Regions:
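Beta-propeller domain segments
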Residues: 19-28, 132, 149-152, 157, ...
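Surface loop/turn motifs at the tips and blade-to-blade linkers of beta-strand repeat domains
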Residues: 35-41, 74-79, 120-127, 174-178, ...
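Beta-strand-rich domains and repeat architectures in extracellular enzymes and scaffolds
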Residues: 35-60, 258-265, 281-282
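Conserved beta-propeller blade signature
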Residues: 53-57, 92-95, 142-146, 193-197, ...
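Short loop/turn segments immediately following the C-termini of beta-strands
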Residues: 58-60, 98-100, 106, 148-150, ...
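Blade-loop segments of beta-propeller domains
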Residues: 65-91
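Asp-box/WD-like beta-propeller blade repeats and closely related beta-sheet repeat scaffolds
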Residues: 82, 99-138, 146-151, 171, ...
Length: 358
């Protein structure tokens, strides 16, 4: 991202947050409601603390914020390098910058006066192209970290992967390769398999390739980048002499250039039972397509056998014609079962709730 664009988005976020947002334009299934939960400049990745504090990373703002359950916002870290990723584990907040991971211990004990982040790992690549990180802890306590490709399409060792950091040994290991730029992943609540989004490459036209929702049933898989896209489309440069059958296909093709970022399996109790263990995806929206697409929260549904049966819109309306007034980034399930959605363009956190009879 250029400095000009980053400044423009930051300015837009501050402006939008200061003005009422046209939430009446957001279309949701019957019974659902959306509201602004908090205003947070350049709100990006989300993580929930044990006491219900919602931590919010940023990309262009250089700061990390905390939103108390009542909606009050605190700045807990500043002056950082693209602190997009946040994760909470054993009472501590973990922050991912471009090239390092830092930690703030016992952060919820005194949220108004927190300690300075302490670096725990500083051997990540320093390239800023796809250099902002999403982080999340696996069920077995490993900190998973993606390393995006430092390009639109290229073959570089040590990039285009998802790996994990062992907090005790400080050893980083590769889990999966062939991933252009993942900015969201989660583990299936029952199978514990890793699922993740991946942003497809640019400049192959409006309709190619699709962004991907991928399932890593085990480690060691290769998902195709830069040789093959969307499971069936060889790259015009890097795909020569390679077959897409060599690689793991996507579990679901998403829209082309929708910029699928955060994803969550819904495990709350507020929404109807049909949403349990289904996947919500934040689609940030296209930037170089002749007709814009994305700018919504989508829903991937499974059938009773665990196979994907549909990919559809859940919340849409941030895109009006060719004008977008918001860009969803990440999602988190709050303690009451409602769904928090970050928006870095509008500079807010939304709360989507459900009540029968609405």
């Amino acid at each position: 991202m250029s400095r000009f664009l980053a400044a423009l988005l930051s300015s837009a976020a501050i402006s939008a947050a200061a003005q009422p947002l046209p939430l009446e334009r957001i279309q949701l299934p019957p019974g659902f409601r959306i509201e602004v939960f908090a205003s947070v400049p350049n709100a990006r990745s989300l993580a929930l603390g044990d006491k219900g504090t919602l931590f919010v990373g940023s990309r262009s703002g250089g700061a990390v914020h905390a939103v108390a359950p009542g909606g009050k916002v605190f700045k807990v870290a500043d002056g950082l390098s693209m602190p997009n990723g946040v994760a909470f584990h054993s009472g501590a907040l973990y922050i991912a910058e471009v090239s390092r991971i830092s930690r703030i211990e016992d952060i919820e004990k005194n949220i108004e006066s927190v300690k300075k982040p302490q670096t725990i790992y500083d051997r990540l690549p320093s390239e800023v192209h796809h250099g902002w990180k999403f982080i999340r802890f696996s069920p077995d306590g490993k900190l998973y970290i993606p390393i995006g490709a430092p390009c639109n399409a290229c073959e570089r060792d040590g990039y285009g992967l998802i790996g994990f950091l062992d907090l005790k040994t400080k050893v980083f290991e590769v889990h999966s390769k062939g991933i252009r730029n993942s900015v969201g992943f989660d583990w299936h609540p029952q199978t514990r398999e890793l699922w993740f989004t991946d942003n497809g490459r640019d400049w192959l036209g409006d309709d190619l390739p699709a962004d991907e929702l991928n399932r890593a049933a085990r480690g060691g898989l290769h998902f195709g980048f830069p040789f093959c896209h969307q499971g069936d489309t060889p790259d015009p440069e890097f795909g020569r002499g390679r077959k897409c059958a060599e690689f793991e296909p996507p579990a679901q093709k998403l829209g082309p250039h929708v910029a699928a970022l955060g994803m969550r399996f819904y495990t709350g109790s507020m929404f109807p039972a049909e949403y349990r263990n289904q996947i919500f995806i934040a689609e940030h929206g296209s930037w170089n397509r002749s007709k814009k697409t994305g700018y919504r929260v989508s829903l991937v549904r499974f059938d009773s056998s665990g196979k994907i049966k549909s990919y559809e819109a859940f919340a849409q309306g941030w895109l009006q014609g060719e004008t977008a007034w918001g860009r969803p980034v990440d999602l988190e399930i709050l303690n009451d079962g409602s769904l928090a959605v970050s928006d870095d363009a509008a500079g807010v956190i939304y709360r989507i709730s459900y009540a029968s009879g609405r």
